[in-house]
Amino acid sequence: MKKLVVLFLAALFLVGNVQAREERGTPAAKLAQDDVEVSTERTQLNINNMAMWIQSDGWSARDPLTGNSGVTYPRSTSQVIFQDGIIWGGRVKDGNDQELRVGGQTYEIGTVPGIIESKGIAQDRDTARLYRIRRDWATADLRLDASEVLNIGLSQVTDAHEEAVRAQYERDWMEWPAELGAPFYDNDGDGQYDPSVDEPGLANADQVIWFVINDLDQGATTTLYGSLPIGLEAQVTLWGYARTDALGDVIFKKFKVIYKGTAEAADDAVIEDMYFAQWSDPDLGDYGDDFAGADVDLSLGYVYNSIDADPGYVPFGLAPPAVGYDFLQGPIVPVYQLDAEGNIAVDEDGNQLLDESSVAIFNEGLRPGYQNLPMTAFVYFAAGSAISDPELGEYVGTQQWYNLLRGFQPQDDVANPVPYTNPLTNADTKFTLDGDPARATGWNDGVPLPAGDRRIVLATGPFEMALGDTQEVVVALLGGISTDRLRSVSKLKFTDQFVQDAYNGFFQVPKPPVQPNVRIVELDETIILDWGWDDDSIQATEGEGSAGFEFEGYNLYQLPSAEATLSQGVKVATFDIENGVTTILGIALDEESG
């Protein structure tokens, strides 16, 4: 196979990345060049086309150094999320007079770092931290990573900065807290994490962040929405894939929530009518021109642009993307067998019988007799409108949030909640904006409110947790970008379907070939690309198939900038194995029709 090619290309390589990062963050002079410290309280998940800030107390998707938006998509371009968080709420029957309680994170953080060691006793938060690993930490080019987590311009990154980030990856790999619940591959099967044998992480991810939080700090919970602590521990795992397909446009977020209780909680304590929600304040480029939407069948809530050009993306020559959240795995609830009269069937001892034909995903496996709840409500509101954010620091905020969790307007009368109304049908609904903007069908944003600063809430429930119970929620933060704002919505939904299928199949999807090791020679109006010189690289790229797929050849693309997506590129050449295979079939989005 010919692997040497002479191309006539515009000299744009790597320039865009440098310019995109140059003006951000604090000057390099503020960092000690010879003693660079990489924070273990805050970091980024940034292995693919999306980058997101996270902090060890649960603060999420907001830059903790600047206070600005904290999710960038596509990576190294503009921001899409100002802040997000997970909210939980339910009727807590643990002996305390205050039953209705809500916790989690929005603009205030109702959680603190650390595990719950026993009822009402939390780990010293000063000993808890974030852990971040990536599989290629020893050999990867970490300059852009260092630029992002240290908040400095790319051209300001020194060898000391890069090696400090590399050293932190190594430390986190060696100190991975498996004993606290952090996931790992137990290669020797002894149940203990040994970094010389085992590997931290899950789901074949290329980058993983793990930390644990709890809600036992009453000062934090009351500052949020006036509630008392519940006694919940949440083990949080974020992960991503260094891929160029749909998995490269996603950040996965898993919340493993354990009800461990407050010090006063009775042994028979239970949380009834409990809900989880993904809350988000999206700012897609310019926050003043945003629309929101939902796809109920996909359990997807999202934000997109109301106009064709967004000031945040025009400098990059990009149409505005669409970004959303999907409950890939909701909380589990039992599914019971029914008798001939439609009642729950029982055995001879009076025990209710589970229907084991129903299967839920739980703990990276399958659990017969249960089902995962989907998104059970999607609501939105606009900053400054009649329906706005629940009140921080006051118990009325708890009441408002509990109505939101159940799909009602954020008012404080829990017994008499006010529903949302579809303005096209005048029917009450728990799923606002559930039309299809790409096809102009159903209720889409712009009615009754004009474009502006949006909040979105995806809720799932109800379910019950007894003391000692564990529930899991897995949320995907996804992006889609195409040639215009509405095609970006279609691309987002296509990505979501791919990601849900991959998740349901435990990520048994074909991996793309390893990128070849390319040598570049620049001549007068000519660039020579040579990827036939490194035998090990050739073997890594061509020698191993994946999930039934075998290597067939190379496509070479020219892109307008380093930030551009493959859809913006022009295919320059194909170098194909001469084996009679002329067509490779696959599922792809028709970007013209959506």
Roles of regions detected by a PLM:
Residues 6-18:
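Hydrophobic h-region of N-terminal signal peptides that target proteins for export
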Residues 20-594:
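Extracellular/surface-associated beta-sandwich interaction domains
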Residues 1-4:
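Positively charged n-region of N-terminal signal peptides that target proteins for export
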